[in-house]
């Protein structure tokens, strides 16, 4: 799994703060320099003022200004299961790699058992891993080895069957039906800081599945490089308060 920031609003936190100050100014923000708009905010430098105002907005629950900037992220190599969870957040915009137009006919099925093309869940290899709705806890080495072997054989066979169906002339859009839900997919997502914080409220939580938790952490890390004061405050003061930022 990898996440990369593709494109984003420049100076997003200046935009957030200008938008927020608009609500309390008699002058038109369109004609007002940033320093003037921020004159009444505590801080010795513009950066301190931005940080302080952003903290105030988030503390008070004034989330509207965080909807003005937007960022687009490229996501590589998440499972179709994780993608389905992510795209339930309908306030974001998505493009998803197509299995109708992209055929995986050059993938070595032997490599699939080692993690290529199909995401391997931790419970397939880690005997100490405990997931939700799990029937058993600790397992012996023999059972763990059998579990891993069954998983690897299953995903390898699925890819072999998929490629055989392609060779028999079945279109990719139909042959894909035999591929597992763990098949990797690339996604492009666009959303604003408020929306991303809402995603994190739900998907960085302990009861979210491991893969989307990892994806959410990578999105937050990338967003912190773009919008640092916002996501540093969110991480320190607001993270894990589930659903507080519901749009």
Curated annotation (Swiss-Prot):
UniProt keyword Metal-binding present: no
Short motif ThyX motif, span: 88-98
Residue ranges of every copy of the ThyX domain listed in the record: 1-237
Annotated FAD binding sites: 88-90, 192-194, 198
Active site positions: 203
Pathway info: Pyrimidine metabolism; dTTP biosynthesis
Signal peptide (from-to): none
Any one GO BP annotation for this protein: dTMP biosynthetic process
Pfam families, A to Z: Thy1 (PF02511)
Description of how the protein assembles with itself and partners: Homotetramer.
Role according to the record: Catalyzes the reductive methylation of 2'-deoxyuridine-5'-monophosphate (dUMP) to 2'-deoxythymidine-5'-monophosphate (dTMP) while utilizing 5,10-methylenetetrahydrofolate (mTHF) as the methyl donor, and NADPH and FADH(2) as the reductant.
Family that this chain belongs to: Belongs to the thymidylate synthase ThyX family.
UniProt protein name: Flavin-dependent thymidylate synthase
């Amino acid at each position: 799994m990898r996440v990369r920031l593709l494109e984003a609003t420049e100076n997003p936190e200046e935009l957030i703060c200008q938008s927020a100050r608009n609500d309390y100014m008699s002058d038109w923000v369109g004609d007002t320099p940033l320093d003037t708009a921020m004159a009444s905010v505590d801080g010795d430098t513009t950066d301190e003022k931005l940080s302080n105002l952003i903290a105030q907005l988030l503390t008070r629950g004034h989330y509207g200004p965080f909807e003005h900037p937007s960022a687009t992220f490229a996501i590589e190599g998440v499972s179709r299961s994780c993608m389905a969870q992510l795209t339930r957040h309908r306030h974001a915009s998505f493009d998803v790699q197509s299995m109708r137009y992209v055929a995986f006919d050059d993938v070595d099925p032997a490599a699939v058992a080692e993690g290529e093309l199909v995401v391997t869940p931790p419970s397939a290899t880690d005997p100490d891993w405990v997931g939700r709705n799990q029937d058993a806890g600790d397992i012996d080495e023999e059972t763990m080895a059998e579990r891993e072997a069954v998983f690897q054989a299953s995903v390898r066979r699925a890819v072999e069957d998929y490629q055989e169906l392609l060779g028999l002339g079945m279109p990719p859009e139909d042959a894909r039906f035999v591929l597992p839900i763990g098949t990797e997919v690339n996604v492009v997502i666009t959303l604003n800081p408020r929306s991303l914080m809402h995603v994190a409220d739900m998907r960085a939580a302990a009861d979210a599945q491991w893969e989307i938790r990892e994806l959410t952490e990578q999105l937050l890390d990338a967003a912190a490089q773009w919008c640092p004061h916002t996501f540093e405050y969110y991480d320190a003061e607001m993270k894990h308060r589930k659903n507080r930022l519901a749009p």
